[in-house]
């Protein structure tokens, strides 16, 4: 009797979708889900354009050939979108009904916290779901790694190196704005990797513009030919900041906003391998009868967490990481450890 029940509940068809912002390595994860599923005798369906495509029934059969020569490509072959309708109870119920209509027993959702919230709703409606952390921001608390972060931070690092070259040639001050609306990990890592003089992140927002101006002036007095400031998107207003700094110091100051280039490009080895491992584990979890789980990476191991727990966790830059970043800057004796207005106040000229 128990064997009959297990046979009835056995996963036969799985789906995979990418949701929210794209991230390098998503294709590696998709490839792993498809091939791991097929190797276990499952049917695999790709859902185009995230939850939006699910509600529009843009669902295709996936073969091993469909994911050939994709591991090295940036973006997502399944496309992605944000879907306001899926935030409603009606949209969520319809999504679950469409999964059943197409025989999808389990669903792998690749995205960030918002995507996981959608997966959680589907799980509550009886659809087995597993989430994979796909975001360049590294802002998911249950994991030390997110798909796309490694590529994005390397893209930003290489771009900042190039800005430094021209900044030195012209003896400029340069503000480079990197992605990270609510999380400053790209800014923090680039601050250390690029040897920036100053780093501004939303988690450790202790910005004092006069102190920053003083740092630039003191740096110039000491013979420094450039001054690199890395500014997270969550603080923003780099153009306005550059104008004020130039007016106050007399030093030519330029703002460079890296923008969406950080989302693109061929994924690094780490993003390809880690995304592949996560994709394979997601399929294994579905086969094992698990649902409402998020795959993560902690302490050298690929692990899984309950989605509810994962969404409840809080993540932030540690005081130690921030202190190291500050102490290694060329202005370590003038660290920006002061309080000032909120990030939005920087928009004033």
Predicted region positions:
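Single conserved hydrophobic/aromatic residue that forms the stacking wall/gate
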Residues: 338-349
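Glycine-rich oxoanion-binding loops at beta->alpha junctions
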Residues: 55-107, 147-154, 158
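Short, acidic/small-residue loops that bind anionic groups at enzyme active sites
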Residues: 123-146, 200-204, 257
């Amino acid at each position: 009797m128990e064997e009959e029940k297990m046979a009835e509940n056995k996963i036969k068809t799985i789906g995979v979708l990418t949701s929210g912002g794209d991230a390098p390595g998503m294709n590696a994860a998709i490839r792993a889900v498809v091939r791991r599923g097929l190797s276990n005798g499952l049917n695999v369906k790709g859902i185009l354009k995230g939850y939006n495509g699910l509600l529009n029934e843009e669902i295709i059969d996936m073969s091993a050939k469909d994911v050939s020569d994709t591991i090295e490509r940036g973006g997502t072959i399944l496309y992605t979108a944000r879907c306001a309708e899926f935030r409603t109870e009606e949209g969520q119920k319809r999504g679950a009904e469409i999964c059943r209509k197409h025989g999808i027993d389990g669903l792998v959702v690749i995205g960030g916290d918002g995507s996981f919230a959608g997966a959680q709703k589907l799980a509550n409606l009886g659809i087995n779901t597993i989430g994979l952390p796909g975001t360049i921001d590294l802002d998911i608390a249950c994991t030390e790694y997110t798909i796309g972060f490694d590529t994005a931070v390397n893209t930003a690092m290489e771009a900042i190196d190039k800005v430094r070259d021209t900044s030195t040639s012209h003896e400029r001050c340069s503000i480079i704005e990197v992605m990270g609306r609510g999380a400053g990990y790209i800014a923090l890592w680039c601050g250390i990797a690029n040897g920036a003089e100053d780093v501004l992140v939303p988690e450790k927002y202790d910005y004092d513009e006069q102190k920053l101006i003083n740092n630039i002036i003191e740096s110039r007095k000491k013979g420094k030919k450039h001054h690199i400031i890395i500014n997270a998107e969550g603080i923003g207003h780099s153009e306005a900041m550059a104008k004020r700094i130039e007016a106050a110091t007399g030093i030519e100051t330029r703002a460079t906003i890296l923008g969406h280039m950080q989302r693109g490009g061929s994924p690094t080895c780490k993003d390809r391998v880690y995304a592949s491992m996560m994709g394979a584990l997601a399929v294994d979890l579905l086969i094992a009868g698990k649902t409402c789980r998020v795959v993560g990476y902690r302490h050298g191991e690929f692990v899984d967490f309950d989605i509810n727990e994962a969404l409840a966790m809080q993540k932030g830059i540690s005081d130690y990481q921030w202190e190291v970043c500050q102490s290694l800057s060329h202005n370590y004796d003038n660290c920006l450890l002061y309080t000032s207005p909120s990030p939005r106040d920087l928009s004033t000229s």
